[in-house]
Amino acid sequence: MNPVPAQREYFLDSIRAWLMLLGIPFHISLIYSSHTWHVNSTEPSLWLTLFNDFIHSFRMQVFFVISGYFSYMLFLRYPLKKWWKVRVERVGIPMLTAIPLLTLPQFIMLQYVKGKTKSWPGLSLYDKYNTLAWELISHLWFLLVLVVMTTLCVWIFKRIRNNLENSDKTNKKFSMVKLSVIFLCLGIGYAVIRRTIFIVYPPILSNGMFNFIVMQTLFYLPFFILGALAFIFPHLKALFTTPSRGCTLAAALAFVAYLLNQRYGSGDAWMYETESVITMVLGLWMVNVVFSFGHRLLNFQSARVTYFVNASLFIYLVHHPLTLFFGAYITPHITSNWLGFLCGLIFVVGIAIILYEIHLRIPLLKFLFSGKPVVKRENDKAPAR
């Protein structure tokens, strides 16, 4: 069994926070991109589309690697049932809190913005359910996926731990070439599964809950397990924290392939299957790029960094409705895309930080948006003198 490191690995905390906060420029740039979203500017920006595609191509793959790393660390710290309970509470409670407080008002706002309030009563019961599944889960999808992954890893992590007890982990050797082949095969396997579903019963792919619980989990689970293995095997972790020109070049070429597929691919053909193969290996290579960069520049303790590490989840949760509000009611009054993008960042981040500070002063909200029970210090219980 692995001992839990005594020293906090600050660069992983920082990377996870930055990846979370990157969701803000990602969604604001989506307004000004050529991609169709809930709200869009009159004229798309080529550079903001490119910026949006870059973030989208790797962000969540790297995020789930870090999530798997810390999840296995806690797996060794707690008994199995407590581990599952703690992990599910920390992601499930914020998700369930955000649905009535954030995504439901967001959905109602969009119904009015897009003029769909009159057509809602005419939808079938299934269409209403499916629309609500997509719109209420919305940007919270990764929290739902983490709940599913945590439940699956009750069995997976037990198998990994049992196998480690019966083998010598020091003899395990990893190479980026071997990992690249494995993830290429995983990407092809995912593409085959998706294409098979598309042939057999295509409507299921547009089902929101099936997409989140099955397809997203299936795609990101290898990255989650890779993170756990990086915690177990120092050699594997060193492989990611050591800069590699090969990984950087491969990631750049994969991103070009991703852009070409976005530009020339067709959803009725093989666009989504091709994208899954590209982003599977691109995500792996970007783990090296991001980890090595973060290990070199972010591996330190700072009060300012700690603040945003703690605030990142809350800011991410509230940024989405704020972004859509900005896109619906403010974007039409700003003619410049870049000026609108910068104003959007200031608007969303500024209000999100204010809301974060307010929620810190309300114990119930602090618990609901973090999933962590409020622990009173002994000093707080002592009578004043």
Curated annotation (Swiss-Prot):
Protein's membrane topology: Multi-pass membrane protein
What gene codes for this chain? mdoC
Alphabetized UniProt keyword annotations:
Acyltransferase, Cell membrane, Membrane, Transferase, Transmembrane, Transmembrane helix
GO cellular component terms attached to this protein's record? plasma membrane
Its EC number(s): 2.1.-.-
Q: What is the lineage of its organism?
A: Bacteria, Pseudomonadati, Pseudomonadota, Gammaproteobacteria, Enterobacterales
Keyword Glycosyltransferase in annotation: no
Residues spanning the membrane: 17-37, 60-80, 91-111, 137-157, 173-193, 212-232, 239-259, 274-294, 311-331, 338-358
| Protein name (record) | Glucans biosynthesis protein C
Report the family membership.
Belongs to the acyltransferase 3 family. OpgC subfamily.
Q: Where in the cell is it found?
A: Cell membrane
